[in-house]
């Protein structure tokens, strides 16, 4: 068997495993319409939903669709997002969630006719940071790396070159729910597709450091 044939087989095995992984995940606030095909999650986002706590606006909401799996330890997570954003605050991306008072949501958000790279970090109250884009984009990749008590967040337009957009605190040594979210605070919903979702375990830095210092 030549290398090309082996590469094709490995690719399709990866696609199958990815699809099986998506099938085993869980919903929080399941939307009325969604499907998983060919390793992609497609959903119609529930209208008038969001994730936010208290600050600036004075309200707390925790009712948008979130499709997740639970992971402990340190990891690198990545996904691709493509959405048909329509009105102000339409958003989609990755969420890393400890509980209803502690979470990070990051991805793309449509505000006043412009696309923004958006991150909301919530610990009791929410903050919001954005990077405005100078043009619409068909898709974006988000990557999150959890190390110790921090999560580094990166974006890419081609899944090759990644740029850091945020470094945020998250309590160490606690399992988190991680996956795909979308919200539509103002509108009547929109369609979004998630693909290439992966979570890769990373060896714990403290433990590996101890092993190195105490090698036989």
Language model region names:
Residues 1-21:
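Bacterial Sec-dependent N-terminal signal peptides
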Residues 20-216:
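Extracellular glycan-recognition regions
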């Amino acid at each position: 068997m030549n290398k090309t044939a082996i590469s094709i087989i490995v690719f399709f095995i990866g696609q199958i495993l990815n699809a099986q992984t998506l099938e085993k995940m869980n919903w929080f606030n399941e939307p009325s319409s969604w499907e998983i095909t060919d390793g992609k999650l497609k959903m119609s986002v529930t209208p008038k939903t969001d994730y936010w706590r208290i600050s600036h606006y004075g309200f707390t909401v925790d009712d948008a669709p979130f499709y997740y799996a639970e992971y402990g330890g340190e990891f690198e997570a990545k996904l691709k997002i493509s959405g048909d954003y329509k009105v102000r605050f339409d958003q989609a991306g990755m969420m890393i969630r400890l509980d209803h008072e502690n979470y990070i949501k990051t991805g793309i958000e449509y505000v006043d006719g412009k696309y923004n790279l958006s991150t909301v970090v919530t610990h009791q109250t929410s903050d919001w940071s954005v990077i405005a884009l100078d043009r619409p984009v068909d898709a974006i990749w988000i990557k999150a790396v959890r190390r110790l008590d921090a999560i580094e967040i990166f974006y890419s337009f081609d899944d090759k070159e990644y740029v850091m957009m945020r470094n945020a605190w998250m309590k160490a040594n606690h399992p988190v729910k991680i996956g795909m979210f979308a919200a539509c605070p103002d509108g009547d919903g929109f369609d979004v597709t998630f693909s290439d979702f992966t979570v890769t375990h990373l060896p714990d830095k403290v433990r590996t450091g101890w092993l190195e210092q105490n090698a036989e």
